[in-house]
């Protein structure tokens, strides 16, 4: 069938299937061809690439992805959209739609079963409430994907890319930048969606590193230190880390900071990932 990227075609499909938008699922459908093309261009899909699309909606973006990719597996949680997707994607033989929650899918098994060892990329339009759980699942579980191109709420994208010493720098910044290089591709105004969301969106590309940015033997300890350091942003590192969930003594914290050459009066938001890695090594040696 023809591309469905226009306000009139989108509305016609919604009316034909009597589809009701779910606020709880954050459903907003794109209606701007330029934005759709920019997303696909940003993903840099090669003819041999396979794509996992999360939240295909009515298949608007899926149609553009399918024209570039070797194969697309679109994971949609809303069963009411499945009949629509079967209709809008009927002409695309390289697309498979799965009606599941991506947080419950065995992603390693899916990739092994569906993609024949070919390169895998992720493209997604994620509502605010599941952005971090979905992104961190791919990264922490080391799901073998080359990149994630995701459309998310502006504030979350800014936090992912923020650097030390800025107001947006936090635990999410470090977690994302530990595993990948974040690059903001484009801003997306509310006017290019049906219905229009109340927030601005950003398309960000997370290029996954072959290995994490820094070498840390105990990344669980590093992220626990990060959580404690940012949990009490106004406190110095000495006070934040000695009164956090790790229950470290002031003596251990002071010795570890000194060995890592980090001033105990600094705050957590000023440390680089490399400094957190060094601090983790020193704390681990004293636990």
Curated annotation (Swiss-Prot):
It catalyses: adenosine(1518)/adenosine(1519) in 16S rRNA + 4 S-adenosyl-L-methionine = N(6)-dimethyladenosine(1518)/N(6)-dimethyladenosine(1519) in 16S rRNA + 4 S-adenosyl-L-homocysteine + 4 H(+). It is an enzyme of class 2 (transferase). The keyword Transferase applies. SUPFAM superfamilies: S-adenosyl-L-methionine-dependent methyltransferases. Its EC number is 2.1.1.182. One of its GO terms (molecular function) is 16S rRNA (adenine(1518)-N(6)/adenine(1519)-N(6))-dimethyltransferase activity. One of its GO terms (cellular component) is cytosol. S-adenosyl-L-methionine binds at residues 28, 30, 55, 76, 101, 125. Keywords: Cytoplasm, Methyltransferase, RNA-binding, rRNA processing, S-adenosyl-L-methionine, Transferase. It is found in: Cytoplasm. Pfam families: RrnaAD. It comes from the Bacteria. Signal peptide: none annotated. InterPro entries: KsgA/Erm, rRNA_Ade_diMease-like_C, rRNA_Ade_Mease_Trfase_CS, rRNA_Ade_methylase_Trfase_N, rRNA_adenine_dimethylase, SAM-dependent_MTases_sf. Transmembrane segments: none annotated. Belongs to the class I-like SAM-binding methyltransferase superfamily. rRNA adenine N(6)-methyltransferase family. RsmA subfamily. This is Ribosomal RNA small subunit methyltransferase A. It comes from Alkaliphilus metalliredigens (strain QYMF).
């Amino acid at each position: 069938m023809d591309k469905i990227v226009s306000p009139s075609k989108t509305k016609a499909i919604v009316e034909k299937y009597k589809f009701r938008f779910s606020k709880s699922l954050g459903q907003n459908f794109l209606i701007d061809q330029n934005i759709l093309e920019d997303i696909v261009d940003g993903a840099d899909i090669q003819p041999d690439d396979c794509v996992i699309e999360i939240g295909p909606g009515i298949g608007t973006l899926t149609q553009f992805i399918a024209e570039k990719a070797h194969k697309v597996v679109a994971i949609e949680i809303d069963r009411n959209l499945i009949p629509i997707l079967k209709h809008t994607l009927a002409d695309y033989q390289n697309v498979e739609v799965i009606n599941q929650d991506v947080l419950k899918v065995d992603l390693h098994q899916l990739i092994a079963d569906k993609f024949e060892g070919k390169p895998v990329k992720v493209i997604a339009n994620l509502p605010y409430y599941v952005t971090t759980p979905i992104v961190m699942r791919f990264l922490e579980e080391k799901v073998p994907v080359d990149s994630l191109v995701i459309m998310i709420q502006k504030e979350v994208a800014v936090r992912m890319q923020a650097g030390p010493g800025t107001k947006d720098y936090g635990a999410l910044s470090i977690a994302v930048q530990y595993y990948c290089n974040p690059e903001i591709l484009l801003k997306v105004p509310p006017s290019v969606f049906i219905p229009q969301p109340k927030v601005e969106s950003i398309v960000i590309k997370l290029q996954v590193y072959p290995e994490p940015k820094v070498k840390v033997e105990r990344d669980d300890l590093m992220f626990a230190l990060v959580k404690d350091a940012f949990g009490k942003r106004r406190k110095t590192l000495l006070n934040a880390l000695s009164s956090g969930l790790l229950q470290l003594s002031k003596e251990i914290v002071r010795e570890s900071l000194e060995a890592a050459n980090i001033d105990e009066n600094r705050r957590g938001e000023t440390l680089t990932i490399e400094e957190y890695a060094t601090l983790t090594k020193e704390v681990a040696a004293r636990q």
